[in-house]
């Protein structure tokens, strides 16, 4: 973490359980991020929190620290049964649930609290086997949680802590009815600690907090600037015919260490992947119909640096903790202006700088005014020389080949095709 991203407040300054502090310091967490410094005094006092902060600001560790401390500092209810978790953390996507679980594991090892994971797609029996042995903290997506609850594999009557992560995304994906179903099976709001964290807190999310939380305190970090001052934004106006060649030229010029390219449809993502894989890039494809095990493998390869570029739909835009992303390319401007914020929030994280490049083509340029109104500023426009765009490009690969691209990354210098103007 960059020092500019941290406050002077230390975790050890709070009256946290010693095992929690020990686990944090062992992982190198000493100073709090702004959202952590705001949230912890409230949660340690037993107050509910609804927190808004840009992605990469430490929301996950804020609610995990609070959850582990609360469970260690408060006894479980009397006569708690083996199928009754003490804390429930709900996430909108499988990938985010897996990431939260990974972040929680060091705390679990240090404290002895048991973790469970529940998400759809695969691993039903494996997840169930863990639950049957009893867990303290259950992390999951709403569909699988409801499935287990209806079959009495889990019972929520002993819940002492509940967390909603990326609550606005829950609305986007239509999960609010599921969330309310789960809340109705928990103890009343005033008998548990409730936390809600998200990059955006819309009116409907605040309404949910009012319904399901106990007079929550609202906390915000940098609410006046939605896109983050560390992200350099840039906009091009290509024709549809030049759009792909412009993207490939920009990649050659920027030569990003780690980049995510967002497009609005699965078909468009597959097209982009085919062009880049054919050109020798180490590129992965992440769309909604990719099998869960493969999605997790691709994310792991990208995080490790075995892949340099990830082409994705917005399934990857929310909540995932992928470190050191240097560039985000909006091949398509998103239809939802909030998705623009979440997309470019993949870069410029944890105090680092980042670069966002958007292509406003003939098809999606009409989305730009709403995006600029939402973020509160115009995106700087850059020009390019059409005659300098790459032309010697190989025929794109088709998806009959492996999606993650197995060609070695080129080690030569980028082609000299600087844009003019």
From Swiss-Prot:
Entry EC number(s): 3.6.4.13
Region annotation (Disordered) ranges: 392-421
Localization per Swiss-Prot or TrEMBL: Cytoplasm
An individual GO BP term: RNA catabolic process
GO molecular function, one term: ATP hydrolysis activity
One cellular component term from this protein's GO annotations in UniProt: cytosol
Binding site for ATP: 53-60
Protein family per UniProt: Belongs to the DEAD box helicase family. RhlB subfamily.
Name the UniProt record assigns to this protein: ATP-dependent RNA helicase RhlB
Gene designation: rhlB
């Amino acid at each position: 973490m960059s020092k500019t991203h941290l406050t002077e407040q230390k975790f050890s300054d709070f009256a946290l359980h010693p095992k929690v502090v020990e686990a944090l310091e062992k992982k190198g967490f000493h100073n709090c991020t702004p959202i952590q410094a705001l949230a912890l005094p409230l949660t340690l006092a037993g107050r509910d929190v609804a927190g808004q902060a840009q992605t990469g600001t430490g929301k996950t560790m804020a609610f995990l620290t609070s959850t582990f401390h609360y469970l260690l500092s408060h006894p479980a209810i009397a006569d708690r049964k083996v199928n009754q978790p003490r804390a429930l953390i709900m996430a909108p996507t499988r990938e985010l649930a897996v990431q939260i679980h990974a972040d929680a594991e060091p705390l679990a090892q240090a404290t002895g609290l048991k973790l469970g994971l529940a998400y759809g797609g695969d691993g039903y029996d494996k997840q169930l086997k863990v639950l049957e042995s009893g867990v303290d903290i259950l992390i999951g997506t709403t569909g699988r949680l409801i499935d287990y609850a209806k079959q009495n594999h889990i019972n929520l009557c002993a819940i002492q802590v509940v967390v909603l992560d990326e609550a606005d995304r829950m609305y986007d994906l239509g999960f609010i009815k599921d969330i309310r179903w789960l809340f109705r099976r928990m103890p009343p709001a005033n008998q548990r600690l409730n936390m809600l964290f998200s990059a955006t807190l819309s009116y409907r999310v605040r309404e949910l907090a009012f319904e399901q939380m106990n007079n929550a305190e609202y906390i915000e970090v940098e609410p006046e600037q939605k896109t983050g001052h560390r992200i350099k934004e840039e906009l091009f106006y290509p024709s549809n015919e030049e759009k792909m060649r412009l993207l490939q030229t920009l990649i050659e010029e920027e030569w990003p260490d780690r980049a995510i390219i967002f497009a609005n449809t699965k078909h468009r993502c597959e097209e982009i992947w085919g062009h880049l894989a054919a050109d020798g890039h180490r590129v992965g494809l992440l769309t909604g119909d990719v099998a869960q095990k493969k999605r997790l493998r691709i994310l792991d390869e990208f995080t490790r640096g075995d892949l340099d570029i990830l082409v994705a739909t917005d399934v990857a835009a929310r909540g995932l903790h992928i470190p050191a992303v240097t560039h985000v390319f909006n091949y398509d401007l998103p239809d939802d202006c909030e998705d623009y914020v979440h997309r470019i929030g993949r870069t410029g994280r944890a105090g680092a700088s980042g670069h966002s490049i958007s292509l406003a083509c003939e098809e999606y340029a009409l989305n730009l005014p709403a995006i600029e109104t939402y973020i509160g500023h115009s995106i700087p426009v850059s020009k390019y020389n059409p005659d300098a765009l790459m032309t010697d490009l190989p025929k794109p690969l088709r998806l009959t080949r492996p999606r993650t691209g197995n060609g070695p990354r080129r080690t030569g210098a980028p082609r000299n095709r600087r844009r003019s103007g």
